[in-house]
Amino acid sequence: MRRTCCLFNSLDSTTRIVPNAIRINHTNSMSLRTSTVSTSTKMFTKHAKNRIGNSIRLRDELYQNYLKNYKKIQLYKKSQPPKKIEYEFVLDILFYGSCAIVFYAICEKIHDRKIRRSLVKEDFSDYPYHGL
């Protein structure tokens, strides 16, 4: 595909060559090549949907890992004597994992509403513990 419109054998004062697939003809009206525009729009939409889908899958996976580690913490708290090293390790995983979940939740809120000025505690009510 050419970056400019096709060259003419004889150029007069009313015909101009314009880059990026836009041609201005002698009536001074602009026309876009619609096939180029619609193809790029479709590709953008497809990639945007893939990114959103991947983001949701990653968030769900983070949340599942978080719940698994949260349950481990409860077991370690109940065990006698407490397993100190493993407890701290799982607690670190729980903290950083939950921070990532909150980050995704914030991004989700921003993207869903485009501009969001404030987040309240109720926005995170479905996460039992987020480590912040």
Swiss-Prot record:
Regions crossing the membrane: 85-107
Q: Which GO terms describe its cellular component?
A: membrane
Q: Which UniProt keywords apply?
A: Glycoprotein, Membrane, Transmembrane, Transmembrane helix
Which domain of life, per UniProt? Viruses
Q: Which residues are glycosylated?
A: N25
Q: Where in the cell is it found?
A: Membrane
Tell me what topology the record assigns in the membrane: Single-pass membrane protein
Name of the protein this chain belongs to: Uncharacterized protein L908
- Please spell out the taxonomic lineage of the organism that makes this protein: Viruses, Varidnaviria, Bamfordvirae, Nucleocytoviricota, Megaviricetes
